[in-house]
Amino acid sequence: QSATTCSSKPYSAQQVRAAANAACQYYQSNDTAGSTTYPHTYHNYEGFDFAVNGPYQEYPIRTSGVYSGGSPGADRVIINTQCQFAGAITHTGASGNQFVGCSNT
């Protein structure tokens, strides 16, 4: 995982990795963050050309710490069900409930 910028919000490679690792741990233990539904299936309706094959899971990424519940914000990391990092996406700048890619996605 590399650093990325979602809209104008930069994330370090470490922040991206932390979110992807949390998503993987929750997914593998069939658990979620707090009382939320994250991680959950990401259907890729937008048609992103990820470097790894799906199926995919989405999980919120934070600038401080790792998401553990509450408001997810606009930004997500995407992993596949083998816990391979696929990319980072954001609702910011997208219409409706869709996503656009962050830098490097």
Curated annotation (Swiss-Prot):
Q: Which organism is it from?
A: Gibberella baccata
Broad class of enzyme this protein falls into: lyase
Q: Which Pfam families match?
A: Ribonuclease (PF00545)
Q: Write down the chemical reaction(s) this protein catalyses.
A: [RNA] containing guanosine + H2O = an [RNA fragment]-3'-guanosine-3'-phosphate + a 5'-hydroxy-ribonucleotide-3'-[RNA fragment]
Q: Which cysteines are joined by disulfide bonds?
A: C6-C102, C24-C83
**Active-site residues, Swiss-Prot/TrEMBL:** H40, E58, H91
Task: Report the family membership.
Answer: Belongs to the ribonuclease N1/T1 family.
Q: What is the lineage of its organism?
A: Eukaryota, Fungi, Dikarya, Ascomycota, Pezizomycotina
Q: What is this protein's name? A: Extracellular guanyl-specific ribonuclease Fl2
Q: Which residues form the signal peptide?
A: none
Task: Give the record's keywords alphabetically.
Answer: Disulfide bond, Endonuclease, Hydrolase, Lyase, Nuclease, Pyrrolidone carboxylic acid
